[in-house]
């Protein structure tokens, strides 16, 4: 179930990256996503955009970016057009195999980074889209654990025993 959607169409030029970054920032502000998770999302979506520009920027005038909010997380999609099958094939290789290579191409580096930072990477073959899913439910769990740790440390300094 999609809760919220956004669409952004930008020229297939690297100089349009600021519009992509603005979309990510707007979404992350709306969902109170900050720090490293914001960085993961921004870097992944930016890499996917730059990857799409590098792979098909000369052939297409525009690249479409989509955002969806789903119960399990935030989804960003980037159109890949004619090069969809080539790009999907790059994502089939194991990350370890790509990292072990002596030399890694710019495209392979982008693929590795996106796969490492996104929680899920999928492809929509009908619409020729690269889909990156970022789970946001675990953010609250991480925050809760961090708060518990900080409170425990605080009470440890006060020498107050914790009642369980």
Positions of PLM-derived features:
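Conserved beta-strand-loop-beta-strand hairpin that lines the nucleotide-binding pocket
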Residues: 1-7, 51-164
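Helix-loop-beta hinge of the Bergerat
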Residues: 3-33
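Charged, alpha-helix-enriched surfaces in structured cytosolic catalytic cores
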Residues: 15, 36, 108-112
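Conserved short strand/loop->alpha-helix "switch" segment adjacent to the catalytic nucleotide/phosphoryl-transfer site
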Residues: 22-49, 99, 103-104
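A generic structural micro-environment signature
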Residues: 16, 39, 127-129
